[in-house]
Design a protein with these regions (language model features):
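Charged, terminal alpha-helix-loop-beta segments
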Residues: 1-129
Length: 129
């Protein structure tokens, strides 16, 4: 089955939305099954920044453009809203009233998403720990 993903009216061609949905399904399932604590969720999406790579000019241009487009597409998505939809769907369809509406809102409010390169990641990690 060929599925296309869109955000803000734009087709996501490089950002792997299917993978992201799988990650968020796993986090939401863990919360609803009480396998994870209900606390701050800082989702860090690590994307390798290839700008310093030494490549042939045409290859470098292609690799850099894919990286830039992936970052752009990633920034189109409201991940807190996507997580809210996934958590709500699983609660209603699979897990029932394991969480109150207040608990759900607290979890959703505590969700953050950060796109990080290999250079930004260590600094960001230090800032949240």
């Amino acid at each position: 089955m060929d599925i296309e993903y869109f955000s803000c009216g734009e087709k996501l061609e490089h950002f792997d939305m299917k993978q992201m949905i799988c990650h968020l399904l796993g986090i939401a399932t863990g919360i609803l099954k009480k396998e994870f604590e209900q606390k701050q969720i800082d989702f860090i999406y690590l994307l390798y920044d290839p700008t310093e790579l030494e490549l042939a000019a045409d290859t470098k241009e292609l690799v850099d453009s894919i990286y830039e487009r992936t970052c752009y597409e990633c920034n189109l998505v409201d991940f807190a809203t996507l997580f809210h939809v996934i958590l709500t769907f699983l609660k209603e369809e699979r897990y029932g009233d394991v969480l109150s509406n207040e608990e759900m809102e607290k979890i959703i409010y505590s969700f953050t998403f950060t796109l990080a390169s290999q250079e930004f990641y260590p600094m960001f990690l230090q800032s949240i720990t």
